[in-house]
Amino acid sequence: MATKLIKHGSKAREQMLEGIDILADAVKVTLGPKGRNVLIEQSFGSPKITKDGVTVAKSIALKDKIRNAGAQLLKSAATKAAEVAGDGTTTATVLARALAREGNKLVAAGYNPMDLKRGMDLAVNAVVEEIKKSSKKINSQEEIAQVGTISSNGDKEIGEKIAKAMEEVGKEGVITVEEAKNFSFDVEVVKGMMFDRGYLSPYFVTNSEKMVAELENPFILLFEKKLSNLQPMLPILEAVVQSQRPLLIIAEDVEGEALATLVVNRLRGGLKVAAVKAPGFGDRRKAMMEDIAILTKGELITEDLGMKLENVSIKSLGTAKRVTISKENTVIVDGNGDKKNIEDRVLQIKSQIAETTSDYDKEKLQERLAKLSGGVAVLKVGGATEVEVKERKDRVEDALAATRAAVEEGVVAGGGVTLLHASQPLTKLKVENKDQQAGIEIVIEALKDPLKQIVENAGENGGVVVGKLLEHKDKNYGFNAQDMQYVDMIKAGIIDPAKVVRTALQDAASVASLIITTETLIVDESSDKEEPMPMRGGMGGMGGMDF
């Protein structure tokens, strides 16, 4: 067992805060319309250029274990904000640093950390309620485009393309982002489907940064029953390996030995594979699998028709241009199904909707109809160089996530203004003691920091701008850092999704509370010895596969 380094009290927290400062200083430069890019060295290929806070945060690991513990805690605030709302990662980082630093000063001065936390929680809950009250639902294409533009660092084309994609497939529709093979940026609607089942093992992930499995031009095997043994599948698996194409398995379940064997072969590179459970339950599951079969020009392997896995040929497998699988969802893009067969299936479902008398059945049939006929909008991002394409693709993905958040919970005045004005009612909150009051004051001060940072990144004095805005009673009155003017932020189209602002604050407060209430820190002692490389097992069997 590795020896441990143990630190206590203010010394431990101070070192953690040093790590927090290092990460926050790297991330904060990206905030606002005049935020700067960060260049990140990659282990292979050209460096990555990004203005995405969470990408910067994820790239940072510090040599000092205690400082690194602080940096990793701060990173978790940015990561959580990205997972829940898709944006607001830099705001979460700036807020968390401010809350943690001020909180630690008061703990060092003798304040009770638990009461400080209670005061902070009271204040955060009050601000969340203010954000909900201030939020305004968005309906028009223009408002959707505004959110996309702001979240992509003022790129109007990105905002307009996202609005167009949402118009094509609906606000709840499936929209994916991929790299184009030319200079253009286009929206293309293709045959596709999304269902709410994710990968059965995280070992199927191919993109560890986004924690998704991406399969290009895969075969798709649809099996009605559970898979617990791969022996009957060996002929078809061998054929897939020889084709050098990936395989997606959709079955009632894949368990035990079958799942373990697929994972081993995926890790050893013998078989590019992912497995997901089939969507739905009972008869509806079978119907949805038949929908997928028609969409991908495959066959549902079902014992009702006397079909057996050992007799399945590669001709029975469906195909698609691309499949993306996250922890919760699977998206099939551009299935190779016959257009006429898909149209016939749509008509069949429509007739079932007309005939059914059950509201529940009707709702489920309409869901199937939407999945089969809605299609998938693909945002194809082009550019002059690989670095430019990747940087722009990151911004498109951020903007798309922020736009979805805006559709879900509405929008508020952007540019840090909503958080700044939400701090004013906090002075009226009732508390039990002075320590809780100090916790509220920590939040009041921290809520100024995102706006200050936006202004300072634009080259102005943040403190002066904050003071001027607090004198103004209009909650939408703010500072347009792009044009360096004081404006009504809503009328100027400078808006943020309410969900993004709310999530950033809640995640920041959660991390800061952990830091100020930490009294002891235990980390592995640094070792200069190189770890020996593990021996790799043989890759016997068919074509590098191990069954």
UniProtKB/Swiss-Prot annotation:
High-level lineage: Bacteria, Pseudomonadati, Pseudomonadota, Alphaproteobacteria, Rickettsiales
Places the protein is found: Cytoplasm
Assigned keywords, A-Z: ATP-binding, Chaperone, Cytoplasm, Isomerase, Nucleotide-binding
Source organism (scientific name): Rickettsia massiliae (strain Mtu5)
Listed name of the protein: Chaperonin GroEL
Start-end of Gly residues biased regions: 537-547
Record field: catalytic activity: ATP + H2O + a folded polypeptide = ADP + phosphate + an unfolded polypeptide
First-level EC class: isomerase
A GO MF label: ATP binding
Sequence similarity: Belongs to the chaperonin (HSP60) family.
One protein family per Pfam: Cpn60_TCP1
Enzyme Commission code: 5.6.1.7
